[in-house]
Structures are given as C-alpha cells and as structure tokens.
Regions:
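Active-site helix of classical SDR
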Residues: 125, 161, 169
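Conserved glycine-rich cofactor-binding loop
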Residues: 18-19
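Conserved glycine-rich Rossmann-like NAD(P)H-binding loop of the short-chain dehydrogenase/reductase
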Residues: 34-48
Length: 247
C-alpha cells in the first residue's frame, strides 16, 4: 500500500509502527514529508491502517511485516526495501515487556526481551548504514525507556536491553558522523497507550511523575520527527528523555 512517490521524498522505516507510540511516530514523520514505511512484526493489517492514515492526510506510506528477531527475515525485508533506494531514516521502536523480578525471571523472559530490542536493532539498522553513507545523509533514532536510565523493579531484562542501545548508539554516532548520519536515543517515561491504565493507575502516575500525568505519544513523536530532520544534524550520540521529569 503506497501513495505516489515523489523522487525527492526521503524514506523512513519505523519498526513497531503499528502500535500507539509507533503509529504516532509514523504520522509525525509523514507530516514532516517522509515516505513512511510502517513496520509490524506480524499484524500487517494494523500497519496498513496506519499507512492509510498517512495517505489520507496527503502523505506517502507503505506497510511491511517481518520479525526483527529473525536475522534472515529481517535481511530479506530490508533488501526488498532497498531495491527502491536508500532508507534515509530508521526509528527502532520495536520492543516488548515481559516483566518479573530477576530472582523469578526465566531465561526465556530474559532472552526474548533482549532479542527484540537489542538484536532487532542490529538486524534492522546494520544493512541500512552503507546505503545511508552513500547518500551522505541518515538518521538512526532508537526508542529506549526511562527504565534504562534510572532502573525499574521487575524490568532488569527490559532495562538491560534498552540501556545497551545507549552504548551502541553513542558508538554508532562516532562511526558514522562524518558521513552525515546521526544516531540518537529517545527515552520515554510513562506514555499513554492501550495498556497504561492497568500498569499505572492515575494516582500512581501522580506520585511517580513530577509532571503528574502520563505523556502523550505525540509528544514523543514530535521529538523523533525533529531528530530525523535536517535541523537536528548536529545532535548526535545523545540520549534524550521525554518523561515529565522522572530522571
């Protein structure tokens, strides 16, 4: 599914683009003029719905589905996208929770969360880098979490996976900065979404977040879209929180 593609349009891939936050990021990038590739791990129909919203607003979009943990599936999916030219921006938003205190956490819980957030980051980003370098322009934005900055009970796996992205991103910024490529991390706090009510009741949010409210997906998406813009070309290797003052 796609709209007519302008020859000058930059292309942006958003992994996990069919969820609440991912969808908001896709819409923001579409409004910023990118041709948006909305990725889903499995729910292609939902990704197509996000793509259609972008098209209905006058933008350009398509939907794709592959498992970011599967190296071969990711390589095939990325190769197919690169047949149409470089992907100029990638937003690594795919991630999962599988919470438990570490003393009671299974090896499967540990590995699965790290596989999606960390190995998925490599599987998707690595094959995009040389085409970006040849284009002399690129943006890599990875979505982390405040848990990676200050920690959170029951999330040693999630915090480990996301904080690993911080180090990888800072190193990548040094490797690719001379090629016009920036790499940054956005670390949201408590953000509104389908599951927020169960995990964080309103009174808990007021106690936990200095801003006394949950953030909106659009507030995170606005920062991601800015980091993908020309105006953010000198911001590189940074971890930027969007968390209402949590840390």
């Amino acid at each position: 599914m796609s709209a007519q593609t302008s020859k000058s349009a930059r292309r942006a891939l958003v992994t996990g683009g069919s969820g609440d936050l991912g969808g908001a990021i896709c819409l923001a990038l579409g409004a910023a003029g990118f041709e948006v590739i909305v990725h889903a791990n499995g729910n292609l129909a939902k990704a197509q719905g996000v793509a259609q919203q972008i098209i209905d607003a006058g933008g350009q979009a398509q939907a794709v589905a592959f498992d970011v943990v599967d190296a071969e599936a990711s390589a095939a999916g990325i190769a197919a996208l690169l047949e149409a030219g470089p992907v100029h921006a990638v937003v690594n938003n795919a991630g999962i929770h599988d919470d438990a205190p570490m003393a009671g956490m299974s090896a499967q819980q540990w590995h699965r969360v790290i596989d999606v957030s960390l190995h998925g980051f490599f599987n998707v980003t690595q094959p995009l880098l040389l085409p970006m370098a040849r284009a002399r322009w690129g943006r890599v934005v990875s979505v982390s979490s405040v848990a990676a900055v200050i920690g959170n009970r029951g999330q040693t796996n999630y915090a480990a996976a996301k904080s690993a992205l911080h180090g990888a991103t800072k190193s990548l910024a040094r490797e690719m900065g001379s090629r016009g490529i920036t790499a940054n991390v956005v670390a949201p706090g408590v953000i509104e979404g389908a599951m927020i009510g169960q995990a964080f009741p309103p009174e808990a949010i007021k106690q936990l977040v200095p801003a006394a409210r949950a953030g909106k997906p659009e507030e995170v998406a606005a920062l991601v879209a800015f980091l993908c813009s020309d105006a953010a070309g000198y911001i590189n290797g940074q971890v930027i929180g969007v968390n209402g003052g949590m840390g």
